[in-house]
Structure formats: structure tokens, C-alpha cells
A protein has these predicted regions:
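Amphipathic alpha-helical segments
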Residues: 25-44
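Short beta-edge strand/loop motif at the mouth of beta-sheet-based domains
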Residues: 19, 39-73, 86
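Short acidic N-proximal helix/loop "leader" segments that mark the beginning
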Residues: 1-19
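Hydrophobic/aromatic beta-strand elements that line small-molecule binding cavities or substrate pockets
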Residues: 22, 73-80, 107-115
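Short, solvent-exposed aromatic-acidic interface loops
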Residues: 92-97, 126-133
Length: 163
């Protein structure tokens, strides 16, 4: 399959959330598998999740494999898994400084939703809850994750359409 052009939608109406969407030239079932299968997720997201699975109510951890971020542990709590509709987890946004203990901070909620458009899958991601992140690092977390989600939406699109 070939990839269709990316349709990105950005909402900056709130400092509390990041929203991104992309149209992927693949069926919902294929995009869902790339999201909900932990090993496939790791393949496009850049995290070592071999042998792991995403189950609602459970924590999942794996080492980031993106150059320059190998010291970071991807640490998420799986909130909801609604097959071919919604996948969500909580995490500490842009928690990359090994000298900082982020465990006492609130988390943000990352929600992926999928919609069949008849021409492919509209995949949307919303990360919300930034208003609860400590002020000292909130703007950097929003800035870095905004760029991160733009890249990750391209990554999943490329992964799904070339695998």
C-alpha cells in the first residue's frame, strides 16, 4: 500500500492538551494492531517492548530506543483498550531527565481514537492534563510532546503502510 498525504489537524485552544490527527491508507484493523500490540507499538514509537502486552489496568515499561533518549524508560499505565476504537494510557510527559523523580507528579492522559473513513483510517491522538504538570516544566513538556506527536503520527503512518 502507498501512503496518502497526511492530514494534520492542530488545536491550540487550550494549554491543557495537544491534538493531532492523520489519515492512514490502511484498514482500522491494521492501524489498531499497530497501536494495541505492544511489540508493534514499540516498532514505530521507538521503545523496546518485546514480550510485553497492553492490558487495561496494568503498567508497562520499556527502554526508549530513539538515539539520544536511550536512558529514558517508557513507563505507562494502560487506561482503556476498546478494540478498533480507543486505546489510552497515562504517563509523565517529557520525563527525560535522569536526575528528576517524576513519580510524584500528575500524569497526562494519551488517547488514540480510530475512525473508518471509507478511504482509510483517521487516527487521532489527544494528550491532556498539562495544566496539572508543575509550572517549572509545563511549557517544555507541551513543546516537546507537540513535536513528538507530530513525528509519531508520521511514524505510525509509515509503519502501517510499509509493513
Amino acid at each position: 500500500m502507498t501512503s496518502s498525504s497526511t492530514s494534520s489537524i492542530s488545536s491550540t485552544s487550550s494549554t491543557d492538551r495537544i491534538e493531532r490527527s492523520t489519515l492512514i491508507n490502511a484498514p482500522v484493523s491494521r492501524v489498531w494492531r499497530a497501536l494495541a500490540n505492544a511489540e508493534e507499538f514499540g516498532g514505530w514509537f521507538g521503545v523496546a517492548l518485546k514480550g510485553k502486552s497492553f492490558v487495561a489496568g496494568q503498567q508497562v515499561q520499556g527502554r526508549i530506543t530513539i538515539p539520544g533518549y536511550e536512558h529514558v524508560v517508557f513507563d505507562v499505565f494502560i487506561e482503556r483498550v476498546e478494540p478498533e476504537k480507543l486505546f489510552s494510557y497515562r504517563w509523565h510527559p517529557y520525563a527525560v531527565d535522569p536526575a528528576v523523580d517524576y513519580s510524584k507528579e500528575p500524569t497526562t492522559l494519551v488517547e488514540f481514537t480510530l475512525k473508518d473513513t471509507g478511504k482509510g483510517t483517521l487516527l487521532s491522538v489527544v494528550e491532556s492534563g498539562f495544566d496539572k504538570i508543575p509550572v517549572a516544566r509545563r511549557s517544555e513538556a507541551i513543546r516537546m510532546n507537540t513535536g513528538g506527536w507530530e513525528g509519531q503520527m508520521e511514524n505510525i503512518k509509515k509503519y502501517v503502510t510499509t509493513q
